[in-house]
Amino acid sequence: MSAATDQILEQLKSLTLLEASELVKQIEEAFGVSAAAPVGGGMMMMAPGGAAPAAAEPEEEKTEFDVVLEDVPADKKIAILKVVRAITGLGLKEAKDLVESAPKPIKEATNKDDAESIKKQLEEAGAKASVK
């Protein structure tokens, strides 16, 4: 790849989930395209190919984990919202949107200790969370 594409790739890797979402919206508007997944046969063709490599390398240990907010009880929403804001550094509106749209990833590509710590904080606030 060229230096320009390498630089863009590195910048994309550093984006937060919220920033990536905003970038997708801007690209859709600027180029008149849609990032929606195709419905129908396209997904069926990709599934078998994606499953084969995972089965071929079962002994590779995972080093990056994603913490996913699975469920938010209505009576615990405020406490969970506070924890999500502390973990992600998001503003009130962004954190609220994230909490209300569960299941959603809260933290991606983090180490195992941090992922478990974040999961514990979310569960102590009353949420259901998982580490993937």
From Swiss-Prot:
UniProt-listed InterPro entries: Ribosomal_bL12, Ribosomal_bL12_C, Ribosomal_bL12_C/ClpS-like, Ribosomal_bL12_oligo, Ribosomal_bL12_oligo_N_sf
Compositionally biased region (Basic and acidic residues): 102-126
MF GO annotations: mRNA binding; structural constituent of ribosome
SUPFAM superfamilies reported in the protein's UniProt record: ClpS-like, Ribosomal protein L7/12, oligomerisation (N-terminal) domain
Keywords: Ribonucleoprotein, Ribosomal protein
CC terms in the record's Gene Ontology section: cytosolic large ribosomal subunit
Biological process according to GO: translation
Presence of the UniProt keyword Ribonucleoprotein in the record: yes
Record's signal peptide: none
Function: Forms part of the ribosomal stalk which helps the ribosome interact with GTP-bound translation factors. Is thus essential for accurate translation.
Entry's family note: Belongs to the bacterial ribosomal protein bL12 family.
HAMAP family, per the entry: Ribosomal_bL12
Quaternary state and interactors: Homodimer. Part of the ribosomal stalk of the 50S ribosomal subunit. Forms a multimeric L10(L12)X complex, where L10 forms an elongated spine to which 2 to 4 L12 dimers bind in a sequential fashion. Binds GTP-bound translation factors.
Stated name of the protein: Large ribosomal subunit protein bL12
Organism, as annotated: Rippkaea orientalis (strain PCC 8801 / RF-1)
